Curated annotation (Swiss-Prot):
GO terms for cellular component: cytoplasm. NCBIfam families: PRK05751.1-4, secB. InterPro entries: SecB (IPR003708), SecB-like_sf (IPR035958). SUPFAM superfamilies: SecB-like (SSF54611). Belongs to the SecB family. Homotetramer, a dimer of dimers. One homotetramer interacts with 1 SecA dimer. Pfam families: SecB. One of its GO terms (biological process) is protein transport. This is Protein-export protein SecB.
């Protein structure tokens, strides 16, 4: 019976593991260079969103994923505000093959972080006395597939730092 329990435990150790350890804000910034004059103008905003992800291997099977959302909102030709959040998470990921690990870090983890980043960004904008910023959901699987296609065409290999 002891041998069966030991063998069962060994089999479990080889099964894929995924666990969210921590979610945190790594960096947060807000600038409203034309305040307070911008509040007296007719509000006709144009929004530019820049999204980026980075991964870094930590000790053992732990990985940090950082999702950066940068938003620049202009009212006419003037910058109304610039807001940026770096939402990060520490994930325990083990026993995945290289393609699965790459997809998990490049799409699955950012998908978990996005609602937190979106909320932090929206809170920042409303605290600056601007209208709420309602960012649409992001298809990280599609973005990941596009990046893999780009890397394949360029002859690059996906890496985890």
């Amino acid at each position: 019976m002891t041998d069966q329990q030991t063998n069962g435990a060994a089999a479990e150790d080889n099964s894929p593991q995924f666990s969210l350890q921590r979610i945190y804000v790594r960096d947060l910034s807000f600038e409203a260079p034309k305040s307070p004059q911008i509040f007296r103008q007719t509000w006709e905003p144009s929004v530019a969103l820049d999204l980026n992800t980075k991964q870094k291997s930590l000790e053992g099977d732990f990985h940090e994923v950082v999702l950066t959302l940068s938003v620049t909102v202009k009212n006419g030709d003037e910058v109304a505000f610039i807001a940026e959040v770096q939402q990060a998470g520490i994930f325990l990921i083990a026993n995945l093959d290289a393609p699965s690990m790459s997809h998990t870090l490049g799409a699955f983890c950012p998908n978990i972080l996005f609602p937190y980043a979106r909320e932090a960004l929206d809170s920042l904008v409303t605290r600056g006395s601007f209208p709420a910023l309602m960012l649409s959901p992001v298809n990280f699987d599609a973005l990941y597939a596009q990046e893999m296609q780009r890397m394949q065409e360029a002859g690059e290999a996906p890496t985890v730092q």
